[in-house]
Each structure stands twice: as structure tokens, then as C-alpha cells.
Amino acid sequence: MDVNTKDGKGRIPIHYATYSKQHEITQILILLQPGSEIDTVDNYGGTPFFYLLLKHESGQNKTLLDFFLR
């Protein structure tokens, strides 16, 4: 699986994983393997980090926030 393959909306799998509140942190961390383009902007101007902040309460998923901020 190429974690950087875009769909018709310009999104890569990590966009959907961070947008969904039903994700497992381990699934997201798997998608965040070396070479993952985590700053990919979709057709709507959103990055995976943007969707993570949009969909999750502050303080939730600190592990993911720490990963994106390093």
C-alpha cells in the first residue's frame, strides 16, 4: 500500500484516519511511517493535522499531536 496515493479529493489515507473519531491510534501511526507526506494538502486546503485538530477535543490523542508537532 502506498500511503501517499491520493484519491479524487486529493486525500491520502492519513487524511481519513485523522478525520474519523472512530480510528485507532495504532492505525494512524502505521500510516505515519517514514516517507508519509503528512503535510499533503487536499482539494479543500486541509492537511491531516488540520483534520486531527478539527475533529478531536483538546487534550485527546496527545500521542498523535506530539507526533505531528515534532
From Swiss-Prot:
Protein name per the record? Putative ankyrin repeat protein RC0502
| UniProt entry tagged with the keyword Transmembrane | no
**PROSITE patterns per record:** ANK_REP_REGION, ANK_REPEAT
Record's keyword terms, sorted = ANK repeat
Highest taxon listed in the record's lineage: Bacteria
Q: Where are the ANK repeats?
A: 9-43
Q: Which pairs are disulfide-linked?
A: none
Q: Which organism is it from?
A: Rickettsia conorii (strain ATCC VR-613 / Malish 7)
Is Ribonucleoprotein among this UniProt entry's keywords? no
